[in-house]
Amino acid sequence: HIMEQAIGQKIADYLIKPVNPSQILLCLKKHIHQREIVEEHTNTSYRQEFSDITYMIDTANTIEEWMAIERTLTRWELELEHVDSAMHDMLRMQREQANNAFAKFVMKNYEHWWANPTTRPIMSQDVMKKYVFPLVDEGEKVFFVVIDNFRYDQWKVIQPLLSEWFTVKEEQMYTSMLPTATQYARNAIFAGLSPLQIQEMYPHLWIEEDEEESKNNNEEALLQTQLDRFRKRYGYSYYKVNESDFCEKITKQFKGLKTPLNVVVLNFIDML
């Protein structure tokens, strides 16, 4: 019972009698020199993995291999961020090397991806039909949350904070279409089409570059066109949140939602 109370109060550590000197020494060392120990271990671990990552970058030939590289580099960026590490420059160099090599990979394969939609990686216009519609078709109530300008490393930072309320059963990456600008990529997600296809099939929903109107004003209408094309008759809700204060207002409405598909666009992250 005493141990449970101590753990519940988030104590740093505890010793159980009878205590020998080595236990006391280990406990003191862990707390007095914790930062130095963690830093040394992190530096050593990254140094050992450096050559493996370089080899991954040099030999990557599939989108799956590049996704694995992104996960690995992001993991190390987050681990080294909290230590005064001599490895920062090495990691920055490795990230730059990966970015340059990935750009060449995309230039080499991008046209082929467009010409072969059945075998290409999942792209912006494929997200809903690949990941969202199947869940709704199975009877799941789905909240599809799109966070603008939200990077993978930012997701990995907030993921542990959400673990109190949510369990991540599966984590997938997809490949954005080019250009990755919101006005193209996000419209492609909701329409399930490339920007050129949107312009040709739904010219009344396409907003040209020289027009002052926001280029993403028709997302809900584009979503409806995709539902119609795939003969999805279920109801849906759509919310676009442009400021953080509005979040509290719409979260109160979520409990009463009966629609199987609920779309939320968070459009203010880059303003924080």
Q: Over which residues does each language-model region extend?
A:
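Alpha4 helix (beta4-alpha4-beta5 surface) of REC/receiver domains from two-component response regulators
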Residues: 1-13
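A short acidic (Asp/Glu
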Residues: 3-6, 27, 135, 154-159
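C-terminal output helix
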Residues: 19-28
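The C-terminal output helix
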Residues: 29-42
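Active-site-proximal alpha/beta segments of enzymes that process anionic O-linked groups
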Residues: 39-51, 152-259
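Anion-binding catalytic surfaces of enzymes that hydrolyze or transfer phosphate/sulfate esters
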Residues: 56-136, 140, 231-272
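Beta-strand elements within well-structured catalytic alpha/beta cores of enzymes
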Residues: 139-158, 189, 261-267
